[in-house]
Amino acid sequence: MLTYQDFLREATTDENKINFIQKAINQHINSDDYKKAVEAYEYYRQRNTAIMQYQKILYTVTGKPIEDVFSANHKTTSNFFYKIITQMIQYSLGNGLIFENENVKEKFTGDIDLKIKKIFRYAAIEKIAFGFYNNGNLECFKVTEFVPLWDEEDGSLKAGIRFWQIDSSKPLRATLFELDGYTEYIREKSQPMRILKDKQKYIKYKQTSEIYGTEIIEGENYPTFPIIPAYCSDKKQSMLEGIKEQIDAYDFIKSGFANDLDDATQIYWLLQNTGGMDDVDLAKFMQRLKTTKIANIDADEGGALTPYTVQVPYQSREVYLERLEKDIYNDAMALNVSGIQAGNITATQIKAAYEDINLRADAFEEQVLEFMQEVFELAGVENEKITFNRSKVVNTSEEIQTILSTGDLLPIEYKIKKILALLGDVDRTKEVFDMLKAESLAMMNQNVEPEEDNTEGEEA
């Protein structure tokens, strides 16, 4: 693992920087973090590597292993990891972040909520992700495309290398990010790596004129490094950790069950008084039986043909699969919605079912808040408060009735906000308040009676 101090020590010239960049990329690709990130993303795509790479083996009489190409080899993969990740992200971030100052989102380009979800989705999958803030834009760097250079003294991120190559026959692109700017590099096929663009500052000021068009006149950098690490919990690990083995066990048992059912669909025939038939004769006999569906048996000589089928035991497998599914959700602190979908469930029962996922969401949202505070520092946002509107399965009518039953104990503004959150319309809070204000003014105007005109007319 190379650090920021290694970079300062080795990258003293342009040539040394290029050598360091190539060495850092190669080491990163061969690191455990990179390999685990690749594996975790395969599980996220429902291409669970343990079962996909499994091959059934037979052993000869001498003990030599050979590949089993005769029996069924189904490979069924579960989708637990994708569901757990998606549930966590959508639960806390699905309705977007709620900023106390509504104008904060205007400081960012594009949909900031979508970008934050992407960053923390990859943080949950791969252990860590990186958010690059630059001039209002927030970009996600994944573990599989970014080499972090950590400071040995304080553990902070001081530099990094982003790299990408769409195909082995295409150029390798790399960008070196430092505190004082970034430099772009390229390595084309059969060519040494070279500088593509010299170091540039992060913040650029442009000037437009009729003669010269738009040109950059000056630039500056941020007070801190503009790439921020993001984690999904204080464990600082992929959410696959701890549940991978259970997912693998589920896949193996389910696939094994499918294989046994496939193999057991065969009908086995017991031939009696046919000891004179060798393997070739038996094969010919079975082929004729399958083709004509008729068999000639000399019963007088004691011959007989009896079919047999195998009943595959399934009760114990079903029980264990159900147990594994429950354990996976419990260990991931996720919500198994099958337990709250049946019947008319009360709000109290729903809240109890959400206990684990609420605890996990508390820890997750702490990481989001820490990340956003660093983003705000770069964006020049001060004293901003963030709240989360969690997406829940609720007994809406019961919750609204509870809010309304408080009477005058709670302010009307608070009750309206809570009801809008339950209805999923929290983003329309200002609009609703404006409508209520307009209606209130209209009613006041209607209640004001015009003054009577008591002026007496003049006599002619």
Residue ranges of each PLM-predicted region?
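Hydrophobic alpha-helical segments and helix-packing faces
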Residues: 29, 33, 49, 62, ...
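Extended, charged amphipathic alpha-helical segments
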Residues: 210-345
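Generic detection of long, well-ordered alpha-helical segments
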Residues: 106-113, 236-247, 318, 362-365, ...
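Short amphipathic alpha-helical segments that mediate assembly, nucleic-acid/protein binding
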Residues: 4, 17, 21, 34, ...
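Extended, regular secondary-structure scaffolds
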Residues: 120, 124-232
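C-terminal helix-loop subdomains that flank or include functional centers
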Residues: 283-286, 292, 296, 315-319, ...
